[in-house]
Swiss-Prot record:
Keywords: ATP-binding, Cytoplasm, Kinase, Nucleotide biosynthesis, Nucleotide-binding, Transferase. GO terms for cellular component: cytoplasm. This is Adenylate kinase. Monomer. The gene is adk. Residues 33-62 are annotated as: NMP. The lineage of its organism: Bacteria, Pseudomonadati, Campylobacterota, Epsilonproteobacteria, Campylobacterales. It comes from Campylobacter fetus subsp. fetus (strain 82-40).
């Protein structure tokens, strides 16, 4: 059975960097972001990829069920047994659909949800300081923060009730955060 770990956090929390560093330094882990998975499925030319492309090419959102099926498909086809996915779920609907799909199969088990916790001020400084793209301005940051914050209480409560939510302080050095997250994941794997 494959073990899935979801890494969540505010924009600028470092969740993508943390997860990619763990996977880069330990080859038993695979790391995916939802956007990468959708693009890879399109590139594969599969039926699912063609369906995804029919939405993306028109600038439409990919339906929830398709996104979750893409995630599960990628996990199943991965040659790794430990999967890190960052930035998912972003809504209550995404969370509930993933939970529904995971409950209906026995190949993948969600072993942990790790939230990289940073203050809004730290997140803002990181995002506006890095200025990676056109979307890294104050107005867009505020919107992204709202999108993150609106469902987070429900997401935390849901995974807390399942006893799989873990918080990591994201306001330390990257080395410390990654080491902490890796230790936490290793302990969860051991059970």
């Amino acid at each position: 059975m494959k073990k899935l770990f979801l890494i969540i956090g505010a924009p600028g929390s470092g969740k993508t960097t943390d997860a990619s560093m763990i996977a880069a330094n330990d080859d038993k882990f695979a790391h995916y972001s939802t956007g990468d998975l959708l693009r890879a499925e399109v590139a594969s030319g599969s039926e699912l990829g063609k369906l995804i492309d029919s939405f993306i090419s028109k600038g439409n959102l990919v339906p929830l069920e398709v996104v979750v099926n893409t995630i599960i498909s990628a996990i199943r086809s991965s040659d790794k047994n430990y999967i890190l996915i960052d930035g998912y779920p972003r809504s209550e609907e995404q969370m509930r659909e993933l939970d529904r799909v995971l409950a209906s199969q026995s190949e993948v088990k969600l072993d942990g949800v790790i939230e990289v916790d940073v203050s809004e001020e730290v997140a803002r400084n990181r995002v506006l300081g890095r200025a990676r793209g056109a979307d890294d301005n104050n107005e867009v940051f505020n919107n992204r923060m709202k999108v993150y914050l609106d469902p987070i209480k429900e997401i935390r409560a849901f995974y807390n009730d399942k006893k799989i939510l873990h918080m990591i302080n994201g306001e330390r050095t990257i080395e410390t955060i990654v080491a902490d997250m890796k230790n936490l994941i290793e302990n969860l794997i051991k059970g």
